[in-house]
Structure formats: C-alpha cells, structure tokens
C-alpha cells in the first residue's frame, strides 16, 4: 500500500515529511489491525503539529465526506496513533473552507448565496464539535468582556468526563491556535435527572 493513497492534498501539492509520517502510520495500522475494512478507502488531506507549553498535539485533517466513517473508528484510531507518536495528543478535524463575507461594493458579486456551512461562525462551531468528539456539547455560554473580547464556555457531556478530561488543555490550545478564540471546557452536573 502506497503512502500517496493515504494523503491527498487539495491542489495536488506534495506532502511534507510530517504528513508522510502520519500517512505511513495509517498504512501500518491498515496492514496490522482490525481497522482494515474501514481504513482501506479513507485518506487525509493534511496534518499539523502544534506546541503548547511543553506538550505537542497532532492535528489531522480529513475530507468532510469521509468524516462520518472516521468518527466510527476515531476512538481506536486516535489511541493507536497516540501510541505511535509517543503520547502526543491526536485530534481529527474535518477540512472546511470559509468563504469571505460578501460586501456591497464587490467587483464580481457571488453568483450564488454563500451557504451557512461556509460561514466563519459555522466553521468555528464545527471545529469545536470535531475537537471534543466523541463527547457531545450540551451547552455553550459566550461571555463578552468590557474590552470586547469573548470567552466561550463550552459545557460537555458529564458521561464522557473520564474519557476526555485529560485532553481538555489540548482542546483549548488547539482551538485557540486554529481560530484565535479563547475557550474553556466544563462538565456541569445534569440538572434534569429524569
């Protein structure tokens, strides 16, 4: 199995060494594990490594049409990749595009209306959903400070606290790096005990 089939970059550009190492890890996982039927048709679009404090995180971008299949195997896949990359936290995010806001005096007006899924807000919300997967976002509070800066408090499902609590700092720093927005994650108690 060739590494080139596991990473297909938009625009046909060549992957760098780090992206090749991720693709190689995916090829090895496909050859040796029970993930083979899932990984056979899947590929990634790009990968990045970011540093925060003394730790590092790996961000893997996947095509949106394949994201649902990636999410089926994400828990096992992330665990195996974290073993291969010596404990670095691995995050899988969908490859999304933000279209600019149309202006009134645009030289070449858009031929069709900008879809909601391509707006900045929708893309940033989707990145947040992808980051915390498999946990579910159950609530969100946006606090606007007097200087105009925003602090987003994201409430996550209490049932998933044990599985992702150790990654909350990673999620915060990755989201800050990708979007420039501050976010804090909380696990509030369920008020509606039915």
From Swiss-Prot:
InterPro entries: Ribosomal_eS7 (IPR000554), Ribosomal_eS7_CS (IPR047861). Keywords: Ribonucleoprotein, Ribosomal protein. GO terms for molecular function: structural constituent of ribosome. PROSITE patterns: RIBOSOMAL_S7E. GO terms for cellular component: 90S preribosome; cytosolic small ribosomal subunit; small-subunit processome. The keyword Thylakoid does not apply. One of its GO terms (biological process) is translation. Belongs to the eukaryotic ribosomal protein eS7 family. This is Small ribosomal subunit protein eS7. It comes from Drosophila yakuba (Fruit fly). The gene is RpS7.
């Amino acid at each position: 199995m060739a590494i080139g089939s596991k990473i297909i970059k938009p625009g046909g550009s060549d992957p760098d060494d780090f992206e090749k190492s991720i693709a190689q890890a995916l090829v090895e996982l496909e050859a040796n594990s029970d993930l083979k039927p899932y990984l056979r048709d899947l590929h990634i679009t790009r990968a990045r490594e970011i540093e925060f404090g003394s730790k590092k995180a790996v961000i893997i971008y996947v095509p949106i049409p394949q994201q649902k299949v990636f999410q089926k195997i994400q828990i096992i896949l992330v665990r195996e990749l974290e073993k291969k990359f010596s404990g670095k936290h691995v995050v899988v995010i969908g490859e999304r595009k933000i279209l600019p806001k149309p202006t009134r005096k645009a030289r070449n007006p858009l031929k069709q209306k900008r879809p909601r899924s391509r707006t900045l807000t929708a893309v940033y919300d989707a990145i947040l959903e992808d980051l915390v997967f498999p946990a579910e976002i159950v609530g969100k509070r946006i606090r606007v400070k007097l200087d105009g800066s925003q602090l987003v408090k994201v409430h996550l499902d209490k049932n998933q606290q044990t599985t992702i609590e150790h990654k909350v700092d990673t999620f915060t720093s990755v989201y800050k790096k990708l979007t420039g927005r501050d976010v804090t994650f909380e696990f509030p108690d369920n008020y509606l005990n039915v």
